[in-house]
UniProtKB/Swiss-Prot annotation:
One of its GO terms (cellular component) is P-body. Residues 1-28, 124-148, 566-618 are annotated as: Disordered. Its main location: mitochondrion. It is a peripheral membrane protein. Phosphorylated. Phosphorylation promotes binding to RNA. Belongs to the RMD9 family. Keywords: Membrane, Mitochondrion, Mitochondrion inner membrane, Phosphoprotein, Transit peptide. It comes from the Eukaryota. Residues 125-140, 579-596 have a biased composition (Low complexity). This is RNA-binding protein RMD9-like, mitochondrial. One of its GO terms (biological process) is aerobic respiration. May be involved in the processing or stability of mitochondrial mRNAs.
């Protein structure tokens, strides 16, 4: 239960006479569908959705009309973004300061550092009207995120701002406005950092101590420090700062920490801070997080009503949060009712709230009929606002379908339609993220049936090729996941597909190819050695100065991990996290999933006509799935193991086979791979980054893999003359 402090001051809102009435006009949808999503401005929002053949009994059909949702009269604010920033939180602090203050210079520097940088890092206001900016959507351009490159001193400004924060923390000049602007700036830093990784314009390795990883750690540490100061009463925030603080922890996936901060704030002795964290802006962010962390829905409703009572108008932040919590609790009627109210109250300036809520219905609504209706409306561009279909919500929709119905045909349709919607010019990060989740489900569905699964995979590759140019991440994802079949023929097929589609391999592909050897039993040590040499040559080609941790990890998985698994000893690898999922039935037309005969067919013309699905029922899904799609894994992966370097798109040079050909498949002792691992480590140890890396490869690895401990005492006496080292230009033997 929560203890709510009595509000000291009720926040001022619009007087009833100032509320703009709903627009009197209604317009029909431009693209009416067979199952329209209906809005009735005079009652709760109503939905008509199809009942799938095998879906839950429909109880979501209500009376309504065919009108478009009513919105308030559209008007635009002409105030500049800079003015908004400078007036940030003006009701909760006094930014006027006398030049006689002993802290005058520090405060001026703080204001210059924070306010100017915050202004430069703001997300530009997007055009949310459906008829404005459609050309941008068609050209594959979407809303830009905070652009740190517009201000080359952005990151330096964040560091200077935190230094000035430390200098001013015990002064009255560091009021709630200034602290809140600093929190907002730190939050923008998180967004900018994430945006750079998502766009895949710079992807460092685990062991590079990358700027992105270091900056994320620094931002998180700074936010934690400010949170502690707020809870200890050293500084205060206004409602904007509190909102950005909780949102930042949510985006860092530190949900429990966000909950703990919020609960401590509202239950603390500082009434001002307690009321700030009960403000609708803040509660709107925390509501869905609270529900997902065990707070009951009646308590969520009570908190919503408590926060609503603090203002005398309908707050969009609060309503969006309550809608998302209601969707998580399967309280769809409440969610739809609030969405209708949000439509009635929205102006163009607030269409962003409608877009966010629309996406929540797609990705978070457990009623697949409702989610499908919102998905179709977004794809058909049938709403008065322009929807940027964020891939995270589509992925969540796919997972909900799979967990509830196990219908892979429905999964395929959503993936195919979404891929068409994103088009040819979408950045690789979006398409790769969608494909990652799709192939997670695909390989779970066919994990024990490669006889049907492999021809299906071939057909999917061809259909994707007909949609858009296949890129390297597409095959990388398939290559990493098809190891579930433990079939060298399939691995070789995917390996050859890079050349078949004229796709140069980056170092990512070479790592995965080596790593995949750990899924095959009938592979020789000579084959593994050749894969290693190919990887080293590629690493040298792209300019690496030492062998990266990701390269060593691929070798370990091909050798030590395979040995431990075959010994029947379970490994403690963090990559083995699984998640139970289960799937929706639909008869929406989609391209044929019928098998194709051979690889040559994959290179056929893109204009092959698609057919309607007429396949046999899909076998029941297995109960395990690699948790590749979790955002925490993807965040780590974005700055780690299987990412190529910035200049890794050059054509690979021909490679000399240092092992004089592949040895025919012959049974080998189970420890041979482990010995090979130690010999390669010893031979290439001069190319380690430092002695600590070498220690992790030997004694450190033996801690997690007990089978390595058995042969580790042979390391110093191993003869490694049979392990060749190719001619290298950039990799240098720097580790002695």
């Amino acid at each position: 239960m929560f203890r709510f402090a009595q509000p000291a001051n009720v926040l001022k809102g619009k007087a009833p006479s100032q509320i703009v009435p709903p627009h009197p006009k209604t317009n029909s949808f431009v693209h009416p569908s067979a199952h329209p999503l209906k809005f009735n401005p005079n009652s709760a929002m109503t939905v008509e959705v199809p009942t799938h053949q095998n879906g839950p009994a429909s109880n979501n059909q209500y009376n309504g009309n065919h009108s478009r949702p009513h919105f308030k009269n559209q008007f635009s604010s002409r105030n500049s973004s800079f003015t908004n920033v400078m007036n940030y939180g003006k009701n909760h602090g006094n930014n006027n300061m006398s030049p006689d203050s002993p802290w005058y210079n520090e405060v001026v520097a703080f204001e210059d550092c924070v306010s100017q940088t915050l202004y430069m890092s703001q997300t530009p206001r997007r055009s949310n009207m459906r008829n404005n900016g459609n050309n941008n959507m068609n050209n594959g351009r979407r809303t830009e995120h905070p652009n740190t490159q517009a201000n080359p001193l952005f990151w330096d400004s964040i560091g200077r701002a935190m230094g000035l924060y430390h200098d001013l923390i015990n002064t009255p000049e560091l009021n709630s406005d200034r602290v809140s602007k600093l929190v907002h700036l730190l939050h923008n830093g998180l967004r900018a950092n994430r945006n750079q990784l998502t766009r895949m314009n710079k992807k460092p390795d685990y062991d590079s101590q990358s700027f992105h990883k270091e900056m994320t750690n620094y931002l998180c540490k700074s936010l934690r420090e400010i949170s502690e100061d707020v809870l200890n009463g050293k500084v205060e925030l206004n409602e904007y700062g509190a909102m950005h603080l909780i949102t930042a922890f949510k985006e860092l996936l530190l949900f429990q920490e966000a909950v703990n901060i919020w609960k401590s704030a509202i239950n603390g002795s500082n009434n001002y801070t307690s009321n700030i964290f009960l403000n609708p802006r803040v509660v709107g962010v925390i509501l869905p997080i609270l529900y997902e962390n065990g707070v009951s829905y009646p308590e969520i409703q009570s908190l919503y009503e408590k926060s609503s009572s603090m203002i005398n108008y309908f707050h969009p932040n609060l309503s969006v949060g309550m809608i998302r919590a209601s969707l998580s609790a399967s309280e769809n009627q409440m969610a739809l009712k609030l969405f209708q109210k949000l439509c009635e109250e929205s102006t163009e300036m607030k269409y962003g709230y409608l877009i966010e809520t629309h996406l929540s219905f797609i990705g978070e609504c457990k009623d697949l009929n409702v989610a499908q209706a919102f998905f179709d409306k977004a794809l058909n561009d049938e709403m008065p606002y322009k929807i940027d279909l964020q891939v995270s919500y589509v992925k969540s929709f796919l997972k909900n379908i799979w967990s509830q119905t196990g219908d892979f045909n429905h999964i395929y349709q959503i993936w195919y339609k979404s891929s068409l919607h994103y088009g040819r010019h979408v950045n690789h990060g979006i398409s790769s993220s969608l494909n990652d989740t799709f192939f997670d489900i695909f390989f779970e569905n066919y994990a024990n049936d490669k006889v049907q699964g492999f021809p299906m995979l071939q057909n999917i590759i061809q259909n994707y090729h007909n949609m858009k140019n296949i890129d390297e991440p597409f095959f990388n994802i398939i290559l990493a996941k098809c190891t579930v079949w433990h079939d060298r023929t399939i691995l070789e097929y995917i390996d050859n597909s890079y050349d078949a589609f004229n796709i140069p391999k980056t170092i990512v592909a070479y790592r995965i190819l080596l790593k995949s050897m750990g899924s095959i039993d009938d592979v020789t040590t000579q084959e593994i050695l050749q894969r290693w040499i190919n990887l080293i040559c590629k690493s040298d080609e792209i300019g690496q100065r030492f062998i990266a941790n990701a390269d060593w990890a691929a070798l370990r998985d091909a050798t030590v991990t395979w040995t431990q698994r075959n010994r029947g000893i379970s490994s403690s690898s963090p990559m083995s996290a699984v998640n139970s999922l289960a799937p929706s039935t639909t008869n929406t037309p989609s391209p044929s999933l019928s098998p194709i005969p051979d690889r040559d067919t994959l290179s056929s013309a893109r204009n092959t006509p698609n057919k309607i699905w007429s396949g046999t029922p899909v076998p029941p899904p297995s109960t395990e799935m690699d948790f590749y799609s979790h955002p925490a894994f993807q965040a780590a992966n974005a700055s780690g193991a299987f990412d190529d370097m910035a200049s890794a798109t050059v054509n690979p040079t021909p490679r000399k086979n240092f092992t004089n050909g592949i040895v025919p498949n012959t049974p080998q002792p189970i420890d041979d791979r482990m010995v090979l691992y130690l010999k390669i480590v010893k031979r290439y140890s001069p190319f380690c980054r430092d002695s600590r890396q070498l220690a992790r490869l030997t004694t450190g690895t033996a801690v997690k893999y007990s089978v390595l401990q058995e042969v580790l005492n042979q390391f110093q006496s191993l003869n490694v003359n049979d392990i060749p080292v190719p001619e290298l230009r950039n990799l240098k033997p720097t580790c002695v």
